[in-house]
Amino acid sequence: MAKGKDVRVRVILECTSCVRNGVNKESLGISRYITQKNRHNTPSRLELRKFCPYCYKHTIHGEIKK
């Protein structure tokens, strides 16, 4: 029997550099990654360094609300 909500949830990580600078003319969009996290082990917002194809470098990608 199920105990309630799932422990693993799907989260979306968005490039903080693209969001902070805004989308300018040479940039085509904002980099987003979809991943999973365990709610019991990581109750706070997730932040990972990932490659942003729009900034052409590794930047911090933070969790956003759906």
From Swiss-Prot:
GO CC, one annotated term: ribonucleoprotein complex
Pfam family, one: Ribosomal_L33
Entry keyword Plastid: yes
SUPFAM superfamilies: Zn-binding ribosomal proteins
Keywords, in A-Z order: Chloroplast, Plastid, Ribonucleoprotein, Ribosomal protein
One example GO MF annotation: structural constituent of ribosome
Entry-linked InterPro entries: Ribosomal_bL33, Ribosomal_bL33_CS, Ribosomal_bL33_sf, Ribosomal_zn-bd
Main location: plastid
Localization per record: Plastid, Chloroplast
GO biological process: translation
HAMAP family (alphabetical): Ribosomal_bL33
PANTHER family for this protein: 50S RIBOSOMAL PROTEIN L33, CHLOROPLASTIC (PTHR43168), LARGE RIBOSOMAL SUBUNIT PROTEIN BL33C (PTHR43168:SF2)
Family recorded in the similarity comment: Belongs to the bacterial ribosomal protein bL33 family.
Protein name as catalogued: Large ribosomal subunit protein bL33c
Gene symbol of the encoding locus: rpl33
